[in-house]
Each structure stands twice: as C-alpha cells, then as structure tokens.
Design a protein with these regions (language model features):
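Membrane-embedded helix-loop-helix hairpins and adjacent transmembrane boundary segments
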Residues: 1-394, 398, 402
C-alpha cells in the first residue's frame, strides 16, 4: 500500500522500467517479440474478463449480454463516434467534440494519426520488418488488425460501464458521491482511474491479480518496444551514420544499450509529472500530432509523387513543426477563417498540418525543376501485392458489425 506521498507510483515506475530493460536491452527485438506473445495473451484474457464481470454485475443477475443492453439503453450517446459540437459535455465540462470532431473522425485527421502510427512509426513497423518474409509480415499485420477490433471491448467499454455505475437517479453523473480516487488535486475528474476502480469494486479476488498483471504487461510491452526503437534509431541513424561510420557490430550493440538506458532514465524522470494531465493517452496523441503530420507527408509524397525532391522533403518536415505549433500557441484573430484559430480539435490540426506540408514539398520540388530522382523507389503493382490469405483476412475484419438488438 502507498503512504500517500506518491512513493508507490515511483516504485512502480522504477520496477516496470527495470523489468522492461532486463530483456529489451540485452535480448533485443527477438526477446521483445517473444515476450509480447505471452503478454498479449494475458492482456486480452484479463481485459475480456474485466469487461465480462462488469457487464454481468450490471445485468442484475442476468448475462453479460443483458448488461451490455442495459448500458446501451442507459447511455446510447456514449456509443456514438460522430459527434456534433456541444452534443456531449464531459464530466470536467469539456466538449467531447474536440476529441471526436464529427466527420473528421472518418475523413480527417484520424487518418493522419493512424497512417503515421501503423505505417511509418519505427515503434510499430520494426516487428513487420523483422518478419521472415513479406507474406509472414502481412499475416502479422492482418492478425494485429483483428486484435485491434477487440480493443473497444476491454478498453472503451469498461469506461462507459464505470460512467453508468456512477449515475444518479436522474441519469446525471453523481459527482458528489464519486470515489476519491477519481478526484484530482485540482478537483478535476481523472478518467484514467476508471479501470483501477472497476477492478477494485467488481472483479473477484482471484482474478484481480491476473488483470493487474495484464495491465502491467501492456505497460511493459509498450515500454520495451519503445526502448528498442529508440536505441535502434539512435545507433543506426545517428551514431553509425554521423558519429562513427566505421563502428563494428560490438560497438553498435554497446551504444544501443547505453542509448536505451538513457531513454529509460529520462522516461522515469518524466513519468511522475504526467499524473496531473488527466487523460495521458489523449495528451500523448495530441502532442505526437505536432511531428507526425510532417513525417507522414514526407513518406506519402516520396511514395506517390515521383518528382518529389530531397530539399522538398527537408523543407516540408522543417516547416511542419512551426505550422503545428501555431495551433498550440499561436494568437487568435489575425484571420476570420476558422482554420487559423488554434482552438480547434487536434485531429483537424493534424490534417491541416499534413496538407500544408505536402503543399510545401510540392512547391519546393516544382521550383527545383521536378527532376526524377534516379535513386528513388520505383512504384509497381508488385510492390503493393498481397497474398490471398491477407486479402481474405481484411475482408472479414472490415465487415460491418450488427447493432445491439
């Protein structure tokens, strides 16, 4: 138990960091991948069990399906992904539209976030690049897409369940009777504490340890992958390419471990400061959006615009940072156009930044004379070909689900 001074948080952070370092720094990507196989099984099973027992509890003696119907009938608006401005106000008084800005969820910045994260982020694609063959890599992507479909069940749904469990007779959130674990230092409601509260209140004693282990597995898995990616990028793209071009494999391994260790130390120092941010995941997504649109724009233009130049890419990615930061700290009122108001949903900010960066790359490349790059990648149909197994998997994954009867 904690003493109230935050020591349990610090000890947990250090413990998880040391555990992740133990196998990611010395075992490399192979150790990370094999450990994740076990961790994902524990994570999915534990998450599904948490949701199941929570739904059974709401089912008033019935099944989990009865509980799900009760939740949907009580707060149907919480299952909507396309929101209008002012449609849902969060318990902290914020407009949920700023997180899910209407159709932008489907045709706007959501694509920027997803394409960057799943297609061009070293943290993710390192697993695919390490596959034995192209076909094996495609199978891994298809399986990951299937697992992604399960996330709403044990990540989103438990939060909605906790919300329903804390409603008063009038259907409003009973703020005055909320568990103190939901109340932050400034009086704001901490949404991220929904899962721990649900585990404490609903889950049988025998399963609490398993579900907590599942949560720890998710943290360690992400941390180990990030450490491995950080050490790889620093070692190969900075140390090997700039500092010591003649470094042998032994030196590279040593430098990679040191880089990963330094990254872990920095993470340990920063992590305790994040507890005051409310929804940490939302905060990470928003500020990752400062750099991701520019990176995505460079890759897309490089792949699909054969006359894109190196200077165009450089100017584009450099320009993307001040463009993105304008929406965070820039002044209001210098233009009547709403897109120049930095108080807009971060998903829309990401889309505008990405489009602006692509335009800069196009203009700079055009000024340079639009010369074909002899070293560029030649795009052919074969480059984007997929196996029949992969295609069938995508068909099943993309099939629409039936609504709750």
């Amino acid at each position: 138990m904690g003493s109230g001074d935050g020591s349990i948080l610090i000890n947990s952070i250090i413990g998880l960091a040391l555990f992740a370092a133990a196998y990611s720094l010395w075992g490399g990507l192979a150790a990370v991948a094999w450990t994740d196989v076990v961790q994902v099984i524990v994570l999915i099973f534990g998450g599904l069990m948490m949701t199941y027992f929570a739904l059974v509890n709401l089912g008033d003696g019935g099944s989990a399906i009865d509980g799900l119907k009760y939740v949907y009938e009580t707060v149907p608006e919480r299952f909507s992904m396309i929101l209008s401005k002012g449609e849902i106000i969060t318990p902290n008084g914020n407009d949920a539209w700023f997180d899910l800005p209407g159709l932008a969820v489907l045709i706007g910045g959501m694509w920027v976030a997803n394409l960057y994260y799943w297609g061009f982020n070293q943290y993710i694609i390192q697993r695919t690049l390490a596959a034995k063959s192209l076909e094996e890599g495609q199978k891994g992507i298809a399986f990951a897409a299937f697992l992604k479909l399960l996330i709403p069940i044990f990540v989103v749904l438990p939060g909605i369940i906790v919300y329903v469990m804390n409603l008063d007779a009038s259907g409003a959130l009973a703020v005055s009777s909320l568990d103190q674990g939901f109340i932050g230092e400034n009086g704001a409601i901490i949404n991220d504490n929904a899962a721990p509260w649900l585990i404490k209140e609903i889950i049988p004693v025998g399963l609490k340890g398993l579900i907590l282990a599942a949560l720890a597995a998710a943290i360690v898995s992400s941390l180990a992958s990030m450490v491995n990616s950080t050490s790889t990028i620093f070692t190969m793209d900075i140390y090997k390419s700039i500092i010591n071009k003649k470094a042998d494999d032994k030196s590279l391994v040593k430098v990679g471990r040191i880089a990963g260790l330094v990254a872990l130390i920095v993470a340990i120092l920063i992590a305790p400061q994040l507890k005051s941010l409310g929804q940490v995941f939302q905060y990470i997504q928003e500020y990752t959006g400062v750099v991701s649109p520019g990176i995505l724009a460079v890759f897309l233009m490089g792949l699909f615009y054969k006359k894109a130049s190196n200077n165009g890419a450089i100017w584009g990615v450099i320009s993307s940072i001040p463009i993105a930061m304008y929406f965070k700290v820039g002044p209001n009122g210098w233009s009547s156009l709403s897109i120049f108001n930095h108080d807009i949903p971060f998903m829309n900010q990401m889309l505008i930044t990405c489009l602006a960066t692509m335009f800069i790359i196009f203009v700079v490349s055009k000024i340079e004379g639009n010369q074909d790059d002899p070293k560029g990648i030649v795009i052919t149909k074969k480059l984007f070909s997929t196996s029949p197994t992969f295609n069938l998997s995508l068909i099943h994954i993309s099939e629409p689900t039936r609504p709750i009867d």
